[in-house]
Amino acid sequence: MTRKILVTSALPYANGSIHLGHMVEHIQTDVWVRFQKLRGNECYYCCADDTHGTPVMLAAQKQGIAPEDMIAKVREEHLADFTGFNIGYDNYYSTHSPENKQFSQDIYRALKANDKIESRVIEQLFDPEKQMFLPDRFVKGECPKCHAQDQYGDNCEVCGTTYSPTELINPYSAVSGAKPELRESEHFFFKLGECADFLKAWTSGNNPHDGKPHLQPEALNKMKEWLGEGEETTLSDWDISRDAPYFGFEIPDAPGKYFYVWLDAPVGYMASFKNLCDRIGIDFDEYFKAGSQTEMYHFIGKDILYFHALFWPAMLHFSGHRAPTGVYAHGFLTVDGQKMSKSRGTFITAKSYLEQGLNPEWMRYYIAAKLNSKIEDIDLNLQDFISRVNSDLVGKYVNIAARASGFIAKRFEGKLKDVSDSALLAKLTAQSEAIAECYENREYARALRDIMALADIVNEYVDANKPWELAKQEGQDERLHEVCSELINAFTMLTAYLAPVLPQTATNAARFLNLDAITWTNTRVTLGKHAINKYKHLMQRVEQKQVDDLIEANKQSIAAAAAPAAEESKYEKVAEQASFDDFMKIDMRVAKVLNCEAVEGSTKLLKFDLDFGFEKRIIFSGIAASYPNPAELNGRMVIAVANFAPRKMAKFGVSEGMILSAATAEGKLKLLDVDAGAQPGDKVG
């Protein structure tokens, strides 16, 4: 039976560029959607730009243009980036749309009629110069706990403390610099606490389609923390309103009050799908009515679970709609084992990747090869990226077609032999359902491992039968025809298995194979006596220079923007990188050990996560013999060289500095002590 499925990715915010972190999610979603379509299911993939809120309003003001003009331009840029990575949306829309306004207001009215909305007077900080109430992130000041300067109004990035903006010491507006005033305002709240019983049942429940949980195990555990145990709940009611001036939709019957962006953003899924339905004739209500038998899945980042697994299902249910079938969260992307960094050039934008001429399907494959169904961070190791793409895609996969196609064209007029009884092909077809199950369950890493294992079997068959030698031997034409036909059929099957991940390659391969399209059926049937076209090279190798140029391009793109940020820091500028010969120029700083742990595979190294005050870094130090229990160093202050050139530590990662230690008479290395009162970032000397 054909399944009817609606799938979404989280909506990118309309005030920044798309980077590879965004691509993790959209590639994960796109692979799943393409697999469903290959299987013959009726599956729609909808997304949109998330366009409302204070940041968008202020960014447009800064550019001197209307918010509507800015978000239209940003949407074009976002869609171009996603399209460049072969993300196949059925509709990419905007939350600033008539459909979204209507749905947002309808849901609000339904919740209000269901006694799930109430108004309260609250106190907020107000910018007297800009005449606007300030969101938490637009208030800065001194942390009330650690007294770090220039911290946001909701949490301290130095000590991690959370607080309300009214608790900041010497607060100021990040918009104008003015001292904010505390004023009262009427706000509207969604009574989320009253939805706890429904949410406890939904979050721990299973979907009726296949009995699988609505949430991943890790997400369910987090929900239990937020929902509380038994009849008690820790859920707070949710402020869904903001005061003018605000770029968004005005709340019905409440002049000057606007829906908070997180109310209308998920409603954007409905709006995008409704826009698609109206264009191509789909029954929208069949997908969103209460009790719908269709499926609806949301792919999101782990940082927005709260909104998608609590607010959104409750909003839908108590406004008379269906709740999601499943909410699937993924982890964050690191590059070479570290958080993406603009200064290191590893904050890689999608646009820069495409402009540097790198094949988007290289990155699609690499990311998919790291993804599974768990909420785990994944790492883009640039050297591994080069070697894996070259080995798997070029060496193992496309090379099969390259090695066999020439003989078929030259010796057999481009026509294949019927090899439906091939033992080799039987091995490939036998894995069809197992690989399909991996894709279905979002176990892409396992699927690709299994596919490459099949490619290994095919390449072993090539080496064992040596078609280039058969071509030289008299009387071996029939055998040559058979072997090369098996290889072309094997290539077709592998292409079908890889098609969700490599859609453009599959399209190009279909032209070579003289097929209208590649479908999942091609994993189970042979081509028979079929004529193919002349082979054209399907994929180039990744070159080291391409990756080096990509990193350099991203460094250069942020150089101008980074300079002002460095000048605004309260800390002295870190000196230029120094070698050992320039030791006297070395810039030493106090750093706090956030975490210290042994390095797997090394008996000498310890890995330090350090807070320098102005930024966090990872440094490896060869002092493991002196500190058999590295956790005892957590919280300690150390002295580190802040401008020592980063070094790649074999397979362990990049060390961004050097920790100073003293060598004892016994040959032990001991960390230098720092007197009480010294703070992370203080200069030593």
Swiss-Prot record:
Belongs to the class-I aminoacyl-tRNA synthetase family. MetG type 1 subfamily. Homodimer. ATP binds at K342. It is found in: Cytoplasm. PANTHER family: METHIONINE--TRNA LIGASE, METHIONINE--TRNA LIGASE, CYTOPLASMIC. Binds 1 zinc ion per subunit. One of its GO terms (cellular component) is cytosol. The gene is metG. Keywords: Aminoacyl-tRNA synthetase, ATP-binding, Cytoplasm, Ligase, Metal-binding, Nucleotide-binding, Protein biosynthesis, RNA-binding, tRNA-binding, Zinc. One of its GO terms (biological process) is methionyl-tRNA aminoacylation. Residues 582-685 form the tRNA-binding domain. A motif ('HIGH' region) lies at residues 12-22. Its EC number is 6.1.1.10. The keyword Ligase applies. GO terms for molecular function: ATP binding; metal ion binding; methionine-tRNA ligase activity; tRNA binding. The keyword Ligase applies. Zn(2+) binds at C143, C146, C156, C159. Is required not only for elongation of protein synthesis but also for the initiation of all mRNA translation through initiator tRNA(fMet) aminoacylation. Its cofactor is Zn(2+). It holds the Pfam family tRNA_bind. It comes from the Bacteria. A motif ('KMSKS' region) lies at residues 339-343. It catalyses: tRNA(Met) + L-methionine + ATP = L-methionyl-tRNA(Met) + AMP + diphosphate. This is Methionine--tRNA ligase.
